[in-house]
Amino acid sequence: MEELQGYLEIDRSRQQHFLYPLLFQEYIYALAHDHGLNGSIFYEPMENFGYDNKSSSLIVKRLITRMHQQNHVILSVNDSNESIFVGHNKNFYFQMVSEGFAVIMEIPFSLRLVSSLEEKEIAKSHNSRSIHSIFPFFEDKLSHLNHVSDILIPHPIHLEILVQTLHCWIQDAPSLHLLRFFLHEYRNSNSLITPKKSISLFSKENQRFFLLLYNSHVYECESVLVFLRKQSSHLRSTSSGTFLERTHFYGKIEHLVVVLRNDFQKTLWLFKDPFMHYVRYQGKSILASKGTHLLMKKWKSHLVHFWQCHFYLWSLPDRIHINQLYNHFLYFLGYLSSVRLNTSVVGIQMLENSFLIDTSINKFETLVPIIPLIGSVAKAKFCNVSGHPISKSVRADSSDSDIINRFGRIYRNLSHYHSGSSKKQTLYRIKYILRLSCARTLARKHKSTVRAFLKRLGSEFLEEFLTEEEQVLSLIFQRTSSPSYRSHRERIWYLDIIRINDLANHS
């Protein structure tokens, strides 16, 4: 039990007590704007945060002056008539303050992240940020495992849970009051996390703010996994301990310590599995194991009860699905992944005797589901729900080359993300939809027919929809007898993809 108490030890020297005064500093808002340009700790591009050119120094000074004059905003949560966010710029001022607040709240987390990387001597690498790096890991590990659990991270049932989560790391009462104010404002505008909304549906104008809250909440829920994994295995754990310093977690788990004081090691023995692997992206996580179905049920039961009893989160058991890898498709990051048993017959000739040997190899396959992807393309108005291409409205001053480049860029981005698919028929279907949609858009602009327009452009139009990997593969396999066959089956994982394309994110 000493190990558990040491793991939950409070590190008071790293708590941040005076963050709220930073909200009145101009450089914080400049920093928020620069982070939007260069990417924040969560590696999101500027356009996702809703920033525009309005963030001038004059507006920032005007906002800070107003906050100085009405500093009681943090105390007026229950009084909707008292707020600094009034007038025709209410939404913009509110967005600016929430963005600045999010940058301030990121400070302790970024410091701990840097400290953790230095302690573990982990080199900063952009490749490690790629979400495509998950699939080579799957390909190497999942083919040797038996069961997989699809886990949906539980949502908070009350706004105060989010506040208390940050309270575990930040001892700054004014900042916490301001956080409550923001949450109540967003609750009134129906922009908060709900069981029916995923992180991709957060308010585009304040995504940094929600990412901060969501990540802190998720890491709090995952803490039990990290602890049990470290205690139940002698193998080296690569899980990050950056977000595991909490001030109130010990109090929440005190009852568990008393109950399991005598049987703690026996309880940990139930979770021993040297072949356990855990991966998460956004609100979905995967727990894969070589163990039995009974072991996976024990993990499921423990997680559900722990979330319910010690984090005050209602997590329904049906949010964790246990399946065998051999007869189940795993839907993750826009791919349908599975492990298939490939059987082949090998003939062996030894002097006068010949043998036929059956060999079976587990093969990891990744497919792109056609129906959800067509649904995403239809939602973007490139086709109807049946997959028939339609024309899009464009600006009258848009040139033909700009329109063609735009459609070609969309397809190349989609193909780039789904380049790891074992079969490319889905991508060929999407290419057909985007090409014909582009042709119909141009024909509509010039008041012509699609046939006449394609005849005029010829092969130049088709080359815009050639992807980089298709061009590279054509050079690599140009001496083979069937380059199209090889490129059709080739899987490529890229290490420069740090987020899901909006069209690819059809979850």
UniProtKB/Swiss-Prot annotation:
**MF GO annotations:** RNA binding
Q: Which keywords appear in this protein's UniProt record, sorted alphabetically?
A: Chloroplast, mRNA processing, Plastid, RNA-binding, tRNA processing
Name its GO BP terms in alphabetical order. mRNA processing; RNA splicing; tRNA processing
Cell compartment(s), UniProt: Plastid, Chloroplast
Q: Where are the transmembrane segments?
A: none
- Keyword Protein biosynthesis present in the record's keywords: the answer is no
What InterPro entries does UniProt report for this protein, alphabetically?
Domain_X, Maturase_MatK, Maturase_MatK_N
Report the principal subcellular site: plastid
Any one Gene Ontology cellular component term annotated for this protein? chloroplast
Q: Which residues form a coiled coil?
A: none
Q: Which HAMAP family match?
A: MatK
Role:
Usually encoded in the trnK tRNA gene intron. Probably assists in splicing its own and other chloroplast group II introns.
Give the similarity note. Answer: Belongs to the intron maturase 2 family. MatK subfamily.
Under which name does UniProt file this protein? Maturase K
Native organism is Magnolia figo
- Tell me what gene encodes this: matK
